[in-house]
């Protein structure tokens, strides 16, 4: 199997810089990095390995971060063509349905809808099966709207179900490089939550909104998450769901401030989330967000990588037992972050490959669509050309559409 030259973030960066007619010096100054570092990024000698760097470069070039990650070019990765194709029907469903104004007012029997909703929450979403969710969610959105409108006996359950499916829709859209669609799903979720009269559900909707706008508008995401955390704070002691969302909102604030290069603020938000996680323990999995001690540990690794502290992840990961986490997607995210951190240390690059391979086995679509995982695999392939390229690394590159047989 021969290795082909993949389109990396660095290559897209150079192409867009030329298209903009901007010099290395101008873009480097706008992004807050040195000219030599930018040159090495463009040549593939260094990785774009954090949100803060990716978003700074995108802002300097006046493009969306997805233009640099090439999210719309992922159809060559194994299984991703079907996932992207399914987004079309999802977009139509989000456009055609409004609260109390469904696109189709007939709907399916509630028992059938409840079974489909259970499948989304217990199988498709935890597996990060974007293609599977793309096939199921459009019809489910329309049918749940019909039930919420025309069947008062099931209205509350249908509204809670709509929050779940809008969360799933936003998850699919965001990870497939459709941030506008994720924002539409989050706004729908907000309208639904307003009907539930529940601080925890309102906090969940605001969390989804902050997540949806995070990459294109990091300061706005921070403001939304911080405001929502303040609003739900009075309920933390009496409502377990509110406590979990309070923790998730502070973790979102920690990530946003890390991406904005404000490490002290990030650490403060992380400490607040840690305190809540210690009280929550295993949690009740409110909103299928999984907040608790183990998930906090996952986020601790994630935040360390984002702050450029990849050397810490090996030690941080030692105390984390992933076996109790039902969501394969969440475990895959952890192993991806572990691989990202380990890859920064030459001595641990084989461990990085093993971590990424574990992540891919758990949630293949999520990992193959992850721009940072793709960057790491590309970089490791480049570094390995002088030596024997491991079978695992070569296989991952092929399945990501980064290498040809």
Where are these regions (language model features)?
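A short, Lys/Arg-rich alpha-helix, primarily the initiator
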Residues: 1-20
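Conserved binding/catalytic microenvironments
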Residues: 3-5, 105, 110, 114-405
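The alpha-helix within a helix-turn-helix
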Residues: 17, 28, 58
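Short alpha-helical DNA-recognition segment
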Residues: 21-41
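DNA major-groove recognition helix of helix-turn-helix/homeodomain DNA-binding modules
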Residues: 32, 52-67
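Short, charged recognition helix plus adjacent turn
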Residues: 70-99
């Amino acid at each position: 199997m021969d290795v082909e030259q993949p389109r990396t973030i660095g290559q897209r960066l150079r192409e867009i810089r030329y298209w903009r007619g901007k010099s290395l010096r101008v873009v480097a100054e706008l992004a807050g990095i040195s000219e030599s570092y930018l040159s090495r990024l463009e040549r593939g000698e260094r990785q774009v390995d954090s949100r803060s760097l990716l978003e700074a470069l995108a802002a300097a070039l006046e493009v969306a971060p997805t233009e640099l990650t090439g999210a719309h070019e992922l159809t060559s990765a194994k299984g991703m063509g079907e996932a992207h194709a399914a987004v079309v029907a999802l977009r139509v469903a989000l456009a055609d349905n409004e609260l109390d104004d469904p696109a189709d007012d007939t709907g399916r029997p509630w028992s059938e809808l409840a079974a489909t909703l259970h499948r989304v929450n217990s199988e498709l979403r935890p597996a990060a099966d974007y293609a599977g969710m793309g096939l199921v969610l459009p019809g489910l959105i329309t049918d749940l709207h019909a039930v919420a409108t025309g069947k008062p006996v099931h209205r509350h359950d249908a509204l809670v179900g709509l929050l779940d499916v809008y969360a799933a829709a936003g998850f699919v859209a965001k990870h497939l490089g459709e941030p506008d669609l994720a924002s539409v799903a989050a706004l729908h979720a907000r309208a639904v939550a307003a009907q539930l009269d529940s601080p925890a559900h309102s906090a969940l909707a605001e969390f989804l909104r902050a997540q949806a706008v995070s990459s294109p508008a990091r300061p706005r995401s921070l403001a939304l998450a911080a405001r929502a955390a303040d609003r739900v704070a009075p309920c933390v002691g009496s409502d377990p769901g509110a406590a979990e969302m309070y923790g998730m909102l502070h973790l979102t604030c920690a990530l946003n401030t890390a991406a904005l290069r404000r490490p002290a603020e990030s650490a403060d938000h992380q400490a607040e989330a840690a305190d809540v996680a210690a009280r929550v323990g295993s949690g009740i999995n409110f909103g299928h967000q999984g907040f608790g001690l183990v998930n906090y540990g996952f986020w601790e690794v994630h935040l360390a990588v984002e702050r450029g502290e990849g050397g810490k992840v090996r030690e941080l990961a030692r105390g984390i037992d992933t076996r109790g986490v039902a969501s394969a997607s969440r475990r895959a995210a952890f192993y991806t972050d572990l691989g990202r951190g380990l890859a920064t240390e030459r001595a641990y690059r084989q461990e990085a490959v093993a971590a990424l391979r574990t992540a891919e086995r758990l949630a293949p679509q999520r990992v193959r669509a992850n721009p940072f995982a793709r960057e790491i695999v590309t970089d490791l392939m480049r570094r390995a050309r002088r030596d024997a390229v491991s079978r695992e690394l070569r296989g991952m590159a092929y399945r990501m559409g980064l290498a040809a047989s």
